[in-house]
C-alpha cells in the first residue's frame, strides 16, 4: 500500500486525512480517561522478567507462554490475582507476549513465581506461532505442534540461550505470525507430498529498515527440529550470540540448512 500511495510519507498523509475525516464527522459517544498511577513501590527486584516502569518503584512482568498459549490453570490464577492488586492489568503485545503492569517489587515476584513454569526460559522460546491448522480453518500446517517439537528438541540438546533467535511460524501464506519480517521464520508448505516448511531469513520490521526475508528453501516438517539443533550447536561453538554470528557469517544459516532443503 505504501508503494501504491507513493511511499511512507504519502501513506502517513493519507492516514492522517482519513483520521481527520472520521474525527470530524463521527460521534464516538465515549471518552477515554487517563488513569493516574498513584501506588508506591515497596522495594527493588532484579529479575530478567521484571522491567522497571517510569513510575518509581513499579514494575512490569513479562509473561510469554510457549506459542502464546497459556496454561488454563495458570491463566485463571493470574486473573484471580489481578483482581486483588491495585492498578494491575495485563497488556498484550503483537508477538504473543503479555505484560502484567503496575506492580510493586513484591507483587512482581508473586507473578514471576506464579507463571514460572508457563513462560519462556530463553530467547528461542520467545518465538511466535499462529494458532495453526489444528484449529484455524485456513491453516495448512500445525504451527503450534511444530513449535512445541522444536522447543523440546532445543531444550533436550542443551542449546544455550541466545544461540537461536525467536522464530516466527505461520501455517499458511496468510502469515499471521509474520515469518517474513524477522531474522528467521517458517511458513507452511509441501515437499514431496509431505508436510514441510518454507524457511525465511534476514527479515526486519524496524521502522526505516523494513525488508521481507529471503525465501531460502523448504524443509520437511520432521527435519526442522534437527536443523535448528544443528544450527544452535554451530552458533554456540563460536561463543557468539545468534545475532552476532549471523552478522559475521552472512550465509552461515543457509550453509547449515542446505542439506535439509
Describe each region flagged by the PLM.
Residues 1-261:
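Peripheral terminal and linker regions in Fe-S/redox and tRNA-modifying enzymes
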Amino acid at each position: 500500500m505504501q508503494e501504491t500511495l507513493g511511499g511512507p510519507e504519502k501513506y502517513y498523509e493519507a492516514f492522517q486525512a482519513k483520521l481527520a475525516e472520521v474525527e470530524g464527522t463521527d460521534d464516538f459517544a465515549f471518552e477515554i480517561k487517563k488513569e493516574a498511577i498513584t501506588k508506591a513501590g515497596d522495594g527493588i527486584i532484579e529479575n530478567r522478567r521484571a522491567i522497571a516502569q517510569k513510575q518509581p518503584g513499579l514494575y512490569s512482568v513479562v509473561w510469554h507462554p510457549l506459542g502464546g498459549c497459556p496454561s488454563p490453570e495458570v491463566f485463571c490464577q493470574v486473573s484471580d490475582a489481578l483482581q486483588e492488586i491495585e492498578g494491575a492489568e495485563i497488556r498484550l503485545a503483537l508477538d504473543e507476549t503479555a505484560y502484567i503492569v503496575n506492580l510493586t517489587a513484591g507483587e512482581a515476584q508473586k507473578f514471576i513465581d506464579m507463571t514460572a513454569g508457563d513462560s519462556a526460559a530463553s530467547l528461542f522460546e520467545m518465538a511466535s506461532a499462529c494458532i495453526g491448522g489444528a484449529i484455524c480453518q485456513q491453516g495448512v500446517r500445525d504451527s503450534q505442534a511444530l513449535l512445541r517439537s522444536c522447543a523440546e528438541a532445543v531444550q533436550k540438546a542443551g542449546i544455550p540461550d541466545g544461540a537461536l533467535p525467536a522464530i516466527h511460524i505461520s501455517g499458511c501464506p496468510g502469515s499471521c505470525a509474520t515469518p517474513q519480517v524477522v531474522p528467521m521464520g517458517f511458513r507452511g508448505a509441501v515437499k514431496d507430498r509431505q508436510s514441510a516448511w518454507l524457511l525465511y531469513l534476514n527479515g526486519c520490521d524496524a521502522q526505516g529498515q523494513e525488508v521481507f526475508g529471503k525465501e531460502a528453501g523448504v524443509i520437511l516438517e520432521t527435519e526442522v527440529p534437527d536443523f535448528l539443533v544443528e544450527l544452535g550447536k554451530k552458533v554456540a561453538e563460536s561463543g557468539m550470540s545468534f545475532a552476532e554470528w549471523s552478522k559475521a557469517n552472512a550465509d552461515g544459516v543457509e550453509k547449515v540448512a542446505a542439506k535439509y532443503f
